[in-house]
Amino acid sequence: MADADSWDADSFEPEEPIKKAAVHDKWEGEDEDDDVKDNWDDDEEEEKEEEEEKKTEAKPTEKKKLSEKIKEKENLQRKKQEELRKQQLEETKRDTPLTPEDELAEKLRVKQLQEDSDLELAKEAFGVVSNNVTGIDAVSPSSKDDFTEFERLLKEKISPYEKSIHYSGFLETLFRDLCLSLEVEDLKKINNSLTVLLSEKQRQEKANKGKKKKKGVLPGGGLKAKMKDDLADYGGFDGGYAQDYEDFM
């Protein structure tokens, strides 16, 4: 048994361990993909950080832009108000001088207009929508009565400016533009209405001129009688110039 054991010991050669194929958890090239993905993730994080920084920088600039827009609107509104006030002052100078009461009323009216415009500007800047619409802006005519009320409000709105030198040109342009969409028959009606108004105005003007002329004209026969009286004064006796004048006549 000892020999067998020694033989076994001499002839025994330890088997080389079978090299197992290297176990790869990942396919070839996946490690590289992971590296690329890691790089992508890093890039995305950097981009997000940059976007956040841009947003934080953009917020104050947006606020600045909004404040600038508000200032621009305020300046524009003030310019319009100043131009309107100058125009009203010029028109007032051309017209009959105002009484102290009229001047005070005009100042109050201009002040009210300025306050209203400032209020509307503030509402627009803060996004406030006013539902308390009144007057002509609240009218949406559909029936005949609605248009009658609309007509009254329009006249009240426009009539205060009838003394302006620009009033007639304003009406001419306004009527022309408003009548562009009308049919021929409707235009004829408007034309006839204005023609009647023109004839009535011309008749009144002639009547007024006739009254002025009559004040300087003597009644019928007055000139002849006056000439006879003058000749009689110069004749001084019966059968003088007055008689000659009668014979001549």
UniProtKB/Swiss-Prot annotation:
Amino acid composition bias (Basic and acidic residues), ranges on this chain: 16-27, 53-96
Region (Disordered): 1-104
InterPro entries membership: eIF3-like_dom_sf, eIF3j
Biased composition (Acidic residues): 1-15, 28-52
Gene Ontology biological-process annotations: formation of cytoplasmic translation initiation complex
Transmembrane segments: none
UniProt keyword terms in alphabetical order: Coiled coil, Cytoplasm, Initiation factor, Phosphoprotein, Protein biosynthesis
GO CC terms in record: eukaryotic 43S preinitiation complex; eukaryotic 48S preinitiation complex; eukaryotic translation initiation factor 3 complex
Gene Ontology molecular function terms on file: translation initiation factor activity
Short name of any one Pfam family annotated for the protein: eIF3_subunit
Role of this protein: Component of the eukaryotic translation initiation factor 3 (eIF-3) complex, which is involved in protein synthesis of a specialized repertoire of mRNAs and, together with other initiation factors, stimulates binding of mRNA and methionyl-tRNAi to the 40S ribosome. The eIF-3 complex specifically targets and initiates translation of a subset of mRNAs involved in cell proliferation.
Descriptive protein name: Eukaryotic translation initiation factor 3 subunit J-A
Annotated source species: Danio rerio (Zebrafish)
Phylogenetic classification of the source organism: Eukaryota, Metazoa, Chordata, Craniata, Vertebrata
